[in-house]
């Protein structure tokens, strides 16, 4: 029996891990005439740390909830430092006791790197793969050397990342970004009916993140921004997307006295598609919102000490990946001291009421998404598609294609072939280069 030990520390990593597990179970990357292809499902066992996606993918039970390690920031992490150290010790011990044949860590470098470093000293021959290259192009380029000393292989999500690691001797493969595996919704009218959105309502999507600290840090300014918008847009409906249903209880106390209509939903991709505009916390969600064809602004702040430390370390002008790749501000950013209600509300209103501005942002964002691996057919967009009038009354109900969305079929389309998606590519490499030789040895022993 071959054991693969996975470690994912947050929802995005859990999604990637779950998809890779599914492809590994489906004999990804093993030739059909291979003597090991029919042996794979019985020969490989998944263990480690993960979430619901990894648990749904197979007989996998997490060593502990990933919410325990879903932390970030220099100062924010301090109150949890002793708890994290215990979890690192527990994970290292579990890896050794499991007699794992392969360790796969996914993102969450604050936790996964420390675990891998300890394990490398104790098990120098254990094969290790890390998925999601650290952003050495943004800050601390020296981390590439550190990763090269520990890992056997690194999977990068961005096409320009491998050279940073190959030049220091680490085998780094570009597999593409996981958002290419998402299915984005295109029928805005049907979604408005599903969420019982009146034909006259304008929809603002709000994302606050997956960490409790992030949510609490942004709630006051986000709610104040929305209240400002409501003064001039009293037909506003706000939908808060929830990374975890339990987060509703955190948000509700901040909404006790508000006048605007709101609801909560965990179906984030549907909400991104149905929204007229989004107020987003910086992160992977911004790529998903852009892929859904929705204009947005990004706002983010951290603890003040963390901010100044980051300012000393970081060497890029933007925090949003689309802006970083474009090297210009396509998506408006309101970071730290600029994360203020008046600035945020003014820009959101501009996107709500200026269809030309909203259209231009979506088109420019789409060009960057294509660089990340999305395929693009002829665009079905025109500036009039952003007029809210098109979604009113009978005209909206009769119109089939007139939507201000970049549809999966017509604009931002991932390949319909499984072997073009990142998790398939990752699973193929894992199986062909790391598992197949082991499985052949097991077959020979039998």
UniProtKB/Swiss-Prot annotation:
It comes from Rickettsia conorii (strain ATCC VR-613 / Malish 7). Residues 379-418 form the RPE3 insert domain. It catalyses: a lipid X + a UDP-2-N,3-O-bis[(3R)-3-hydroxyacyl]-alpha-D-glucosamine = a lipid A disaccharide + UDP + H(+). GO terms for biological process: lipid A biosynthetic process. This is Lipid-A-disaccharide synthase. Pfam families: LpxB. It is an enzyme of class 2 (transferase). Keywords: Glycosyltransferase, Lipid A biosynthesis, Lipid biosynthesis, Lipid metabolism, Transferase.
